[in-house]
Structures are given as structure tokens and as C-alpha cells.
Amino acid sequence: MDDDIAALVVDNGSGMCKAGFAGDDAPRAVFPSIVGRPRHQGVMVGMGQKDSYVGDEAQSKRGILTLKYPIEHGIVTNWDDMEKIWHHTFYNELRVAPEERPVLLTEAPLNPKANREKMTQIMFETFNTPAMYVAIQAVLSLYASGRTTGIVMDSGDGVTHTVPIYEGYALPHAILRLDLAGRDLTDYLMKILTERGYSFTTTAEREIVRDIKEKLCYVALDFEQEMATAASSSSLEKSYELPDGQVITIGNERFRCPEALFQPSFLGMESCGIHETTFNSIMKCDVDIRKDLYANTVLSGGTTMYPGIADRMQKEITALAPSTMKIKIIAPPERKYSVWIGGSILASLSTFQQMWISKQEYDESGPSIVHRKCF
């Protein structure tokens, strides 16, 4: 597709928004899904202070702002802020006119129907797009890995789900969703760092902890053994310099934090860990296709970026599955963006072009058309 008419692909995650042009191999714009509003009254006249900041600008001024994420657990909870993020995406990041190009949006599986109707409505009525489509995130990740059958364990900032897909169709009865993801791990790390005597409380400090998490955390292959190692030596300790120059040391927190993915009881949650959820999802599928799912377990999303997570998944699922089963965990290096990459592939396929919901169809049937045309 030509860049001047290439479709726009926007993957609105709970934590990061990824946007760019169909046919590209990576998103052009990646920025935090944050809207910040000033905490204090502006006193300097002529400073050109705004009443809200989006994305990186909100992040850089976080010391004076209250930061809000309009998407929680993959579901848009604040549409006014969401509109600001889309506006920022089109006009500031990509610098394109949305009324000239089709837009592909993504959504979490098992999202409320009203959510996708509202997305459709805003695209056509506020941004006047000529055509749009809403795709399920996990399905796009599978496309990006070059498969049509497999089970995707997609874990981002707000929600984790396991989606079995057979010959390109998601199997809705077997999709499982776990409201435990990156943001919960950041909160948990804030909590266990407090036990070490470091206090992080504000929305701005939470972003610092998120950075610590991304740079230093990893998944232990054997949690108990790792805890013993951490207790007996300082070999696992790492230091991190805070923005004010203070240096903090972090030890067993490095692997205790992501361990919550496998043991949600750490967060006081009764749900199963990601390994069991994946296994349960496979068990809800027809017995004939399970073998293909075990052999094509694809990890996607930012929360699967921890070193050691693929080996641990392999170990845990092997323990749950029948002993003769061949299990393969696929963790592509670009999995942080695989949803976007899958969207870019999909929107540039010639066979996909008749799948778009056009402005004309929308005008005839209203927002509910999205349920008929997008699955």
C-alpha cells in the first residue's frame, strides 16, 4: 500500500498506545496512554499552560500533573480522555488527517459490546474516517507470528488473556481473561519496595517504579530456590538510580514482582496463574485441536518481556499437560509490538479490503454494524 493512502493502525493498550501505517514493520509512534491535568493553579501568565497533556508530554511534566489512564483492564473507562489520546495520535504523532484514511483499531477479547460501538461511533462521527475496523488483539499477535492456529497468551499493562485460535478463528468459549497485568505488577512492586523502606506513592512515582520493573525484574525458573539464593548471598542484588540521584538496592523483589503472574495469591487474588489459565483455555477446546495449541503457544504483550518467562511457562505447562505432549512456547523478540505488527499485516492484505466498515454502511446501520462486520 502506498504511504499516502495507507491505512492507519492504532493499538490502544491500557499502558501504551502504538500507532502507525499499514505495511510498516513497526509502529511510528509509541507513547503512554496517559492524560495529565495540572495539580496546581497556573501563576505565570503567558506560559501557554494547557488544561491537559497527553502521552510523553504528560510523562515529562508528571511532577506537576495528576496522571490518569483512560483505559483500565483493556476497557475504555473515560471516553473524553480517550478522544484526546486519539486526537493526539492522529494530529500530533502521525500528523495525518483521519478523514482521509481507513483506521484499524484493536480491542481486548470479551470486551463489552458497548465499548466497541462507542469506538466505532467516535471514529465516524468525531474523526470522520472513511472506513474503520476493530480487530481482536490476540488474533493480530498470531498473524504477526506467521501462524493461523495456536494459543496466544497476551499480557499487557491492564489485562491478560489466553485466546485459542484455530485456522484464523478465535474460539470464544475457550477465551479466558485475567485482570492481572503490568499495572498490577507495578503496584505490587511499589508495595514490596515499601517493605524495604523506599516509599513510592504518587502517580508520578508509580512511573519510576514501572521503569525499575522494566529494567530489573525477571522470572525465576524455580521460585523457592531463587528465594533461598537471594537470602544467602547478594549476587542477585542490583542498584537503581532515582531521578534525584539517590541510589536504591533491589534484591529478591526483582523476581518476587513478576512471580505474581504465576501466583496471583501474592496480590490477594483468587485467580489461577498465567500458566494454569493457558492450560485451562486449551482444555476448553476440542480434544482434536489441543495438540496444535500446545505446540503453538505464543506470548505477546509487554508483560511477557521479562527474562526467563518463556522457560518458566514451558516448565509449568509441561507439568500440567499429558506427559507425551510436545509443548512449544514461542516468544518472538518483537512481541511487545506484535499486536500492532499483526494489524499492519492485516490492514495491508488485498483480501482484507472488503472487510472495512465504510462510512456509508455506518450511516445506514449505526454503531451496531461493528458486531456484524468485525469478529
Curated annotation (Swiss-Prot):
Record keywords: Acetylation, ATP-binding, Cytoplasm, Cytoskeleton, Hydrolase, Methylation, Nucleotide-binding, Nucleus, Oxidation, Ubl conjugation
Catalytic activity: ATP + H2O = ADP + phosphate + H(+)
Transmembrane segments annotated in the record for this chain: none
Modification sites for N-acetylmethionine: 1
Pfam family of the protein (one): Actin
Compartment annotation: Cytoplasm, Cytoskeleton; Nucleus
Enzyme class at the top of the EC tree: hydrolase
Record's comment on post-translational modification: ISGylated.
Residues recorded as bearing N6-methyllysine in the entry: 84
Record-listed Tele-methylhistidine modification sites: 73
Primary site of residence: cytoplasm
Enzyme Commission number: 3.6.4.-
Domain of life the protein comes from: Eukaryota
CDD domains: ASKHA_NBD_actin
Function: Actin is a highly conserved protein that polymerizes to produce filaments that form cross-linked networks in the cytoplasm of cells. Actin exists in both monomeric (G-actin) and polymeric (F-actin) forms, both forms playing key functions, such as cell motility and contraction. In addition to their role in the cytoplasmic cytoskeleton, G- and F-actin also localize in the nucleus, and regulate gene transcription and motility and repair of damaged DNA.
Family that this chain belongs to: Belongs to the actin family.
Subunit structure, interactors included: Polymerization of globular actin (G-actin) leads to a structural filament (F-actin) in the form of a two-stranded helix. Each actin can bind to 4 others. Identified in a IGF2BP1-dependent mRNP granule complex containing untranslated mRNAs. Component of the BAF complex, which includes at least actin (ACTB), ARID1A, ARID1B/BAF250, SMARCA2, SMARCA4/BRG1, ACTL6A/BAF53, ACTL6B/BAF53B, SMARCE1/BAF57 SMARCC1/BAF155, SMARCC2/BAF170, SMARCB1/SNF5/INI1, and one or more of SMARCD1/BAF60A, SMARCD2/BAF60B, or SMARCD3/BAF60C. In muscle cells, the BAF complex also contains DPF3.
PANTHER family referenced in this protein's UniProt entry, alphabetically: ACTIN
Descriptive protein name: Actin, cytoplasmic 1
Gene that this polypeptide is encoded by: ACTB
